[in-house]
């Protein structure tokens, strides 16, 4: 079975905990994605900000979006897979954590990519993807 590097999006947009949510949202628009990894100064993932995190943790709570930053909305710690992880390992993590995207880290723990259900589906792993979509889409799913 292929590993995650064969299907991941390499060098994804990322931000720091101090990045304004307005800038995070702009990154999502510019990169046509719903998740931005939050990294430290060594580019190691600390967490992720999803469009759902912004809606639920900031907007729905009535917090000021003009002063909120990535750290205020991020899901942490980041669930990650290593570059040498199999697609099956990524699917299992997505299913267990009820997530649709997983940051990929290199041997040093630095962000190198993101793998998503869509990436796996496009790679022809439709059976595994259908099962993950079913699992993460059930009512009560924790996060997008």
PLM region spans:
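Tandem CBS (Cystathionine beta-synthase) repeat/Bateman regulatory domains
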Residues: 1-144
């Amino acid at each position: 079975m292929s590993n995650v590097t064969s299907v991941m999006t390499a060098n994804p947009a990322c931000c720091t905990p101090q990045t304004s949510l307005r800038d995070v949202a702009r990154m999502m628009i510019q990169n046509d994605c719903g998740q931005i990894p939050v990294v430290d100064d060594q580019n190691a993932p600390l967490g992720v900000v999803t469009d759902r995190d912004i809606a639920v943790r900031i907007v729905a709570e009535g917090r000021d979006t003009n002063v909120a930053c990535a750290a205020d909305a991020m899901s942490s710690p980041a669930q990650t897979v290593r570059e040498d992880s199999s697609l099956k390992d990524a699917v299992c993590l997505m299913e267990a954590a009820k997530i649709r995207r997983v940051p990929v880290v290199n041997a040093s723990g630095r962000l190198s990519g993101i793998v998503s259900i869509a990436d796996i589906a496009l790679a022809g792993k439709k059976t595994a993807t259908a099962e993950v979509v079913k699992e993460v889409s059930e009512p009560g799913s924790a996060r997008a």
